[in-house]
């Protein structure tokens, strides 16, 4: 069924297809149809960050930036759903075209630029949702906020989403917001993490619950840089790391149509690079922080490879675009079949 739907959707421009798919998934969720139309994955509960996940395969941020289809995605069988990236104020993102398919490589290039309707709109959609499972909210900074004031934007979003989220992801790794990736390193990272940790303790006291914080990092880091990030996350008391975002690399797609477009590359070509980061993080963290692995999962076995590399959970996005809901089941089954 999804194969036919994909053939039709792929005749449209990528962004039109994305918006239409989101509308359809959202409508199916409101009507309760998605669960009936899609075979559900096997039950594989797991506890991470003090949260109970129905299964370890989640939806990565970026597909549902505004929380438009939370119920719909949950009904497809995802063990958790992450929405966003959301910013304090609405913003249109980068000029179109800004989303490109590379079907020969099972890949996507995007330079969306955190297009979203703002954190207040997203919170309205969360309140309207019936979903009771694990919901992650991914936060970022507005395009026109100077990097040296980025902490302010993250704190605004943290304050607003704190009571609505099961966990909160801090996106410092999108390649499509100028200067954002500099926040992954050195004093910039320390200042951000310290500010987040301090504000989180204040919010935990005010609301009587401690919401886990995860940091999403890029795949384009050396082993030494990755080790420094791991140390900073442990020192600051973060709760998880998501590895990874899209890559600026173009290995294997340079000669393909749209392969030279600017933006972040996701899908199959980032699998090896992303899994390597997971392995390095696992060695540095020594089990002290869980790893949520994203990047390049287009087959069920790729999810198992991420878990074997040291991840506790996985997320999919581009693979879902190409393979549909069946990939959720394949990934859950592959993880369930791993030796204990």
Swiss-Prot record:
Residues where FMN binds: 61-65, 85, 138, 171, 216, 244, 267, 296, 317-318
The enzyme's E.C. designation: 1.3.5.2
Oxidoreductase in keyword set: yes
Gene3D superfamilies: Aldolase class I
Catalytic activities: (S)-dihydroorotate + a quinone = orotate + a quinol
A GO term from the CC aspect: plasma membrane
Cofactor, free-text remark: Binds 1 FMN per subunit.
InterPro entries: Aldolase_TIM, DHO_dehydrogenase, Dihydroorotate_DH_1_2, Dihydroorotate_DH_2, Dihydroorotate_DH_cat, Dihydroorotate_DH_CS
Any one of the GO BP annotations: 'de novo' UMP biosynthetic process
SUPFAM superfamilies on file: FMN-linked oxidoreductases (SSF51395)
Keyword set, alphabetical order: Cell membrane, Flavoprotein, FMN, Membrane, Oxidoreductase, Pyrimidine biosynthesis
Recorded metabolic or biological pathway in which this protein acts: Pyrimidine metabolism; UMP biosynthesis via de novo pathway; orotate from (S)-dihydroorotate (quinone route): step 1/1
Active site residues per record: 174
CDD domains: DHOD_2_like
Binding site for substrate: 65, 110-114, 171, 176, 245-246
Cofactor(s) this protein cannot do without: FMN
Family under the similarity heading: Belongs to the dihydroorotate dehydrogenase family. Type 2 subfamily.
Annotated function: Catalyzes the conversion of dihydroorotate to orotate with quinone as electron acceptor.
Protein name: Dihydroorotate dehydrogenase (quinone)
Naturally occurring in which organism (per UniProt): Pseudomonas putida (strain ATCC 47054 / DSM 6125 / CFBP 8728 / NCIMB 11950 / KT2440)
């Amino acid at each position: 069924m999804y194969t036919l739907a994909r053939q039709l959707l792929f005749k449209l421009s990528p962004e039109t297809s994305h918006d239409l798919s989101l509308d359809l998934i959202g409508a199916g969720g409101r009507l309760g149809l998605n669960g009936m139309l899609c075979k559900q994955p096997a039950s594989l509960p797991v506890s991470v960050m003090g949260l109970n996940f129905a299964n370890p395969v989640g939806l990565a941020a970026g597909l549902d930036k505004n929380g438009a289809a939370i119920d719909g995605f949950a009904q497809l069988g995802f063990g958790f759903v992450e929405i966003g990236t959301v910013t304090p104020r609405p913003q249109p993102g980068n000029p179109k075209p800004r989303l490109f398919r590379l079907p020969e490589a099972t890949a996507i290039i995007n330079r969306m630029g955190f297009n979203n309707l703002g954190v207040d709109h997203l919170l309205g959609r969360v309140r309207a949702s019936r979903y009771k499972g694990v919901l992650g909210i991914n936060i970022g900074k507005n395009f026109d906020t100077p990097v040296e004031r980025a902490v302010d934007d993250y704190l605004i979003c943290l304050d607003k989403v704190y009571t609505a989220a099961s966990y909160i992801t801090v996106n410092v790794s999108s390649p499509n917001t100028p200067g954002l990736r500099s926040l992954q390193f050195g004093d910039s990272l320390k200042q951000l993490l310290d500010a987040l940790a301090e504000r989180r303790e204040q919010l935990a006291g005010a609301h009587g619950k401690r919401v886990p914080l995860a940091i999403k990092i890029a795949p384009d880091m050396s082993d030494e840089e990755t080790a420094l990030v791991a140390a900073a996350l442990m020192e600051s008391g973060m709760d998880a790391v998501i590895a990874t975002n899209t890559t600026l690399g173009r290995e294997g797609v340079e000669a393909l149509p749209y392969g030279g477009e600017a933006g972040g590359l996701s899908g199959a070509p980032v699998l090896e690079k992303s899994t390597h980061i997971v392995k390095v993080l696992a060695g540095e963290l020594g089990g002290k922080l869980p790893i949520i692995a994203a990047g390049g999962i287009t087959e069920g076995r790729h999810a198992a490879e991420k878990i074997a590399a040291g991840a506790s959970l996985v997320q999919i996005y581009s693979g879902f675009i190409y393979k549909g809901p069946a990939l959720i089941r394949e990934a859950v089954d592959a993880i369930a079949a791993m030796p204990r």
